[in-house]
C-alpha cells in the first residue's frame, strides 16, 4: 500500500500515544531543575561528571583558553543529549545529518583559528611551515598544511555523522533480521535479539563517546591557537 505524500510529516506514535510528548519531556526528566542546589544523587552525579569533564578538557589551556569553558560544556551536553534522544523509537537524530554537524564544526573551528591569528599571529603562521624544512619543499608543505587546516572541520563533522549513522543502520538491520527470523527459527531470532540488545547498549556508549570526542578535538584546536 502506498503511503500518504505527507506521511513523513505526521507526528510519530506508538501504541496510540504520541512520541513527541516523550521526546519533549525527556530533557527535563534527564536534567531536572531542583528547588535547591543539590537535590538528589542524580544531580550529584551530573555535577560530578560535568566537573570531571571540564577539568580534563581545560587542564591543558591557559587563562585565555579557559574562557571557552561554558561553550565546550554546552557543546558536549548538546551533542550527547541529541545522540541519546535519537535512540528513542520513532525519533530522528539530527547528528546523522552532515549539514548540521558542519554547521557546528565550521563556526567552532573558525573561532579557534581566528583566536590564534588574533593573539598568536606569528605562531599560527609558523604552523604552515615546520622548522627545518628543506628549501625546495617549502611551497609544497605550505599547501599541504593549508589543506590539512581546512580539512579539520570536515573531519569533525564526518566523524560524528559516520559513527552515529553506522550505529543506527546496524540497529535497523539487526532489528529487521530479528523480526524476519521469528517465523523461521525462534532460536536464531532469540540470539539475534540478544545481539540487538547488546548493540543498543553499545550505541548508548557511542552516543556519549562521540560527543566527548567532538568536544575534545575542538578543545585541542583551541589549545593550538591560544
Curated annotation (Swiss-Prot):
UniProt superkingdom: Eukaryota
Transmembrane intervals: 11-31, 68-88, 97-117, 138-158, 164-184, 189-209
Catalytic activity: H(+)(in) = H(+)(out)
Protein's membrane topology: Multi-pass membrane protein
Classification via Pfam families: ATP-synt_A
Subcellular location: Mitochondrion inner membrane
Signal peptide span: none
An MF annotation (GO) of this entry: proton-transporting ATP synthase activity, rotational mechanism
Keywords per UniProt: ATP synthesis, CF(0), Hydrogen ion transport, Ion transport, Membrane, Mitochondrion, Mitochondrion inner membrane, Transmembrane, Transmembrane helix, Transport
GO cellular component: mitochondrial inner membrane; proton-transporting ATP synthase complex
Gene Ontology biological process terms from the UniProt entry: proton motive force-driven ATP synthesis; proton transmembrane transport
Keyword Endoplasmic reticulum included in the entry's annotation: no
Family statement drawn from the similarity comment of this UniProt entry: Belongs to the ATPase A chain family.
Function: Subunit a, of the mitochondrial membrane ATP synthase complex (F(1)F(0) ATP synthase or Complex V) that produces ATP from ADP in the presence of a proton gradient across the membrane which is generated by electron transport complexes of the respiratory chain. ATP synthase complex consist of a soluble F(1) head domain - the catalytic core - and a membrane F(1) domain - the membrane proton channel. These two domains are linked by a central stalk rotating inside the F(1) region and a stationary peripheral stalk.
Subunit relationships: Component of the ATP synthase complex composed at least of ATP5F1A/subunit alpha, ATP5F1B/subunit beta, ATP5MC1/subunit c (homooctomer), MT-ATP6/subunit a, MT-ATP8/subunit 8, ATP5ME/subunit e, ATP5MF/subunit f, ATP5MG/subunit g, ATP5MK/subunit k, ATP5MJ/subunit j, ATP5F1C/subunit gamma, ATP5F1D/subunit delta, ATP5F1E/subunit epsilon, ATP5PF/subunit F6, ATP5PB/subunit b, ATP5PD/subunit d, ATP5PO/subunit OSCP.
Name of the protein in its database record: ATP synthase F(0) complex subunit a
Amino acid at each position: 500500500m502506498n503511503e500518504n505524500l505527507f506521511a513523513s510529516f505526521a507526528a510519530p506514535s506508538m501504541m496510540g500515544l504520541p512520541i513527541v510528548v516523550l521526546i519533549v519531556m525527556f530533557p527535563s526528566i534527564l536534567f531536572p531543575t531542583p528547588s535547591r542546589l543539590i537535590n538528589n544523587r542524580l544531580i550529584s552525579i551530573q555535577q560530578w561528571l560535568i566537573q570531571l569533564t571540564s577539568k580534563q578538557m581545560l587542564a591543558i589551556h591557559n587563562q585565555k583558553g579557559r574562557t571557552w569553558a561554558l561553550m565546550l560544556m554546552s557543546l558536549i551536553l548538546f551533542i550527547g543529549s541529541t545522540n541519546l534522544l535519537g535512540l528513542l523509537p520513532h525519533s530522528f537524530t539530527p547528528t546523522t545529518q552532515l549539514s548540521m554537524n558542519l554547521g557546528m564544526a565550521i563556526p567552532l573551528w573558525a573561532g579557534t583559528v581566528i583566536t590564534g591569528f588574533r593573539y598568536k599571529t606569528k605562531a599560527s603562521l609558523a604552523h604552515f611551515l615546520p622548522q627545518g624544512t628543506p628549501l625546495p619543499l617549502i611551497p609544497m608543505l605550505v599547501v599541504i598544511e593549508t589543506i590539512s587546516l581546512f580539512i579539520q572541520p570536515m573531519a569533525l563533522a564526518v566523524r560524528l555523522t559516520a559513527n552515529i549513522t553506522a550505529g543506527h543502520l546496524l540497529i535497523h538491520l539487526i532489528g529487521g533480521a530479528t523480526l524476519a527470523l521469528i517465523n523461521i527459527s525462534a532460536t536464531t531470532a532469540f540470539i539475534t535479539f540478544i545481539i540487538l540488545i547488546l548493540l543498543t547498549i553499545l550505541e548508548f556508549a557511542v552516543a556519549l563517546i562521540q560527543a566527548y570526542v567532538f568536544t575534545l578535538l575542538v578543545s585541542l584546536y583551541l589549545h593550538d591557537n591560544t
